[in-house]
Amino acid sequence: ELVQVAENEIKLFVDVLKGQKTGFFIDQRDNRSLLRQYAKGKSVLNVFSYTGGFSLSALAGGADSVVSVDSSSMALDLAAQNVQINEFSGEHKSLKMDALPYLDNMDEAYDIIVLDPPAFAKHKSARHRALKAYQRINEAGLRNVKPGGMLFTFSCSQVVDNQLFFDTIRAAAINVGRSISVLHRMRQPADHPVSIYHPEGEYLKGLVLSVD
């Protein structure tokens, strides 16, 4: 059964029983609000969109168009419902595809691209493979940001720390020949506190990049 909730006056349905993390990633609340501030008049691509949290925030901020890409039909159906109940003026389109094939083969550039993948590594033994995956998706994302546009990119892998993530994004930019500048460094919100005795609790990290 779906439950309707609200975040910053945006209405949305969540599946608290079957959805991931009780149906909505509340740890991205502040970061969605940040995207909203930059979205007015922009074209936005939200990859690994799930039920459309970042897409809804972009539309609420006045984005002209938003494309949500995810591999789950159920998540995309819910995203479409969430867009519908808010009656946004911007255009929204959902695409059921795996992220990497879509990013590698897309022929359209966007003002803003959001990359919010699942955790690519849950153990240190998988960290090297995860870093390669982060680099690859960010290379693909950076290729498709319009000059002067922005990339919102995240990692929720606890074993990939802030410096490793930063170094990986820098390598991706160098490989595809894009000049980037850091506008914001993002993390989980205050209701997901990090104990000084357990720094590993700081699992969510992100960057907002200006791309030239």
What is the predicted function of each stretch?
Residues 41-50:
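Conserved class I S-adenosyl-L-methionine
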Residues 51-64:
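Conserved SAM-binding loop of SAM-dependent methyltransferases across substrates and taxa
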Residues 74-114, 120:
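S-adenosyl-L-methionine
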Residues 88, 145-147:
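Helix-to-beta-strand junctions that scaffold the AdoMet/dcAdoMet cofactor pocket
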Residues 150-212:
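C-terminal catalytic and target-recognition region of SAM-dependent MTase-like enzymes
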